[in-house]
From Swiss-Prot:
Pfam families: RBFA. It comes from the Bacteria. SUPFAM superfamilies: Ribosome-binding factor A, RbfA. This is Ribosome-binding factor A. The keyword Glycosyltransferase does not apply. One of its GO terms (molecular function) is ribosomal small subunit binding. The keyword NADP does not apply. Belongs to the RbfA family. NCBIfam families: rbfA. PANTHER family: RIBOSOME-BINDING FACTOR A, CHLOROPLASTIC-RELATED. One of several proteins that assist in the late maturation steps of the functional core of the 30S ribosomal subunit. Associates with free 30S ribosomal subunits (but not with 30S subunits that are part of 70S ribosomes or polysomes). Required for efficient processing of 16S rRNA. May interact with the 5'-terminal helix region of 16S rRNA. Keywords: Cytoplasm, Ribosome biogenesis. The gene is rbfA. Monomer. Binds 30S ribosomal subunits, but not 50S ribosomal subunits or 70S ribosomes.
Length: 117
């Protein structure tokens, strides 16, 4: 990713957090966090990584709500960030948080099984 793509991604991350928390009224979108935004080098596609508090069903519902609001979100981004063309937005779950939690759980299990001397 180029330096410009990184800057656009960081700005989009900030704006998306604001748009999702303040502008979207869809009840399917619960407690949601934008963890990362990766913009392609040509600034045409933005992959938005999200984390949702809750089970798999809540995650799927949040993704459906975001897909429904994608056009509105893209137009809001276009009005807030000066770009020739607003990137196409793709939402994906950020699996790294679940992976990190799983690793932490395994480490705690190993420590609890370790015999004390």
């Amino acid at each position: 990713m180029s330096m410009r793509a990184n800057r656009v991604g960081e700005q989009m991350k900030k704006e998306l957090g604001d748009i999702i928390s303040r502008k979207l009224k869809d009840p399917r979108i619960g407690f949601l966090t934008v963890t990362d935004v990766r913009v392609s080098g040509d600034l045409q596609i933005a992959k938005v990584y999200i984390s949702v508090l809750g089970d798999e069903k809540k995650r799927e519902e949040a993704l459906k709500g975001l897909a429904k609001a994608k056009g509105f979100i893209r137009s809001e981004i276009g009005s807030r960030i000066r770009l020739r063309k607003t990137p196409e937005i793709e939402f994906e779950f950020d699996e790294s948080i679940d992976y990190g939690n799983r690793i932490e759980t395994l480490i705690h299990e190993l420590h609890s099984e370790k015999p004390s001397e």
